[in-house]
Swiss-Prot record:
The active site is at residue 53. Keywords: Isomerase, tRNA processing. Substrate binds at residue 114. NCBIfam families: hisT_truA (TIGR00071). It catalyses: uridine(38/39/40) in tRNA = pseudouridine(38/39/40) in tRNA. Homodimer. It comes from Chlamydia trachomatis serovar A (strain ATCC VR-571B / DSM 19440 / HAR-13). Signal peptide: none annotated. Formation of pseudouridine at positions 38, 39 and 40 in the anticodon stem and loop of transfer RNAs. This is tRNA pseudouridine synthase A. The keyword Electron transport does not apply.
Amino acid sequence: MTKKIVLQIAYQGTSYSGWQYQPNALSIQEVLETILKKIAGFRISVISSGRTDAGVHAQGQIAHFHCPDHPHFTDPRQIQKMLNALLPHDIVIHDAVMTDGDFHSRFSAIAKEYRYTLSLLPKPLPHHRLFCFSPRYKLNIARMQEAAQYLVGTHDFASFANLGREYSSTIRTLYTLDLSEQEHLVTVICRGNGFLYKMVRNIVGALLDIGKGKYPPEHLLDMLATKDRRKGPPSAPPYGLSLHHVCYPPPYQWFCKHEHNNSSEGK
């Protein structure tokens, strides 16, 4: 069986068109594949757990590639060192492992965690400005937290899925949707078995409407019931969002920070 190298990747998405290769813009995937080609002498395709959008960051993106028959690709630690030596400053390989199983970065995943950071300051601090969104109006965090709980569980999230994409199903399960406040920053922690296109940013956009008093917390129940994205609020900007963690079942828990209580979590 062909061996695979699995990478845990962090990146600042500010300068990129997203994860996926784009013909007229620079992507994270293109940068990685270009460097792997430089090392191996031929093209190597890198497959990720999911496609982050333009401007979205990652702390724990997972990607894999089939290990070529090449002397530079026998030791995952050496591969990590070589990649980090050649990658730009805004992409880092946190870890690398080798597997000979049926692991697939996307299809083996059982849960993902995204985090969206909000600044409560009118103007974010310089070292935060690329990683958080400042709505510049007062937010009632308690009401946002109350509203968030209406979305926890298994629901049809059609109202939170951007138009223009075809989905085999818009039903997803959120295990956690919490707000954590620390000084002038609020982090929206969203963990689920899978996410629709721009789903997290659309959820944050809806929570912002609740937080500024436009709607009561129960409005999110109405949004779920309508199943119509056109009646929803604008998406929150991409630069506040980060793919924080991807979780896999045994024996693929190389990078897992915590176990999930529900052993039946889906992909």
